[in-house]
């Protein structure tokens, strides 16, 4: 028992700069964690006929030292061997705590000033909703907000999701996620 307490003490002393998992949170009023994503947010194309509107996202309790945010939507179940990037937006100002519904329009009109929406695996910037192949089991769509230790990532709007993901993981102080599901 004494060894367990020593381990806990060392973790607290050695990891003071790491945000605990329960601190930073992201939610959406229209997509609940582990629930089915509505047609409002489904892609319009590739055989899907949704409204392709990005959901409102809200986050709270970002860690001290956050200098910017980024948001990604990623489908790890896409039959590509490498998943599918549905939305990548970064350089979101540090005082932002909400992305309004529709902020992911490809023209960037609803996104926070100064932010960049880069390429998705649909071949365009902005939000691209769920549209898994017919007959697949429902896919998981992971909505993640990253709290970053840098003001800006040194990337442009033509950066791939994988490239942005690399920079996000190199500069994240904390991240918060929830998962929606969709199948057809």
Regions from the PLM with identified roles:
Residues 1-5:
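Positively charged n-region of N-terminal signal peptides that target proteins for export
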Residues 7-17:
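Bacterial N-terminal signal peptides
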């Amino acid at each position: 028992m004494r060894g367990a307490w020593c381990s806990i003490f060392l973790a607290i002393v050695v990891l003071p700069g790491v945000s605990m998992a329960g601190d930073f949170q992201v939610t959406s009023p229209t997509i609940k964690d582990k629930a089915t994503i509505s047609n409002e947010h489904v892609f319009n194309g590739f055989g899907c006929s949704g409204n392709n509107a990005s959901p409102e996202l809200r986050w709270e309790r970002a860690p001290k030292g956050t200098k910017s945010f980024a948001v990604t939507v990623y489908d790890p179940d896409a039959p590509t061997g490498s998943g599918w990037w549905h939305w990548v937006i970064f350089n979101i100002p540090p005082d932002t705590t909400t992305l309004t519904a529709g902020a992911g329009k490809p023209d960037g009109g609803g996104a926070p000033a100064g932010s960049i929406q880069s390429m998705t695996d649909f071949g365009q910037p902005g939000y691209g909703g769920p549209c898994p192949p017919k007959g697949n089991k429902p896919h998981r769509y992971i909505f993640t907000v990253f709290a970053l230790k840098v003001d800006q990532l040194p990337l442009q709007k033509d950066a791939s999701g994988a490239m942005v993901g690399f920079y996000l993981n190199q500069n994240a102080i904390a991240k918060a996620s929830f998962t929606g599901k969709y199948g057809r």
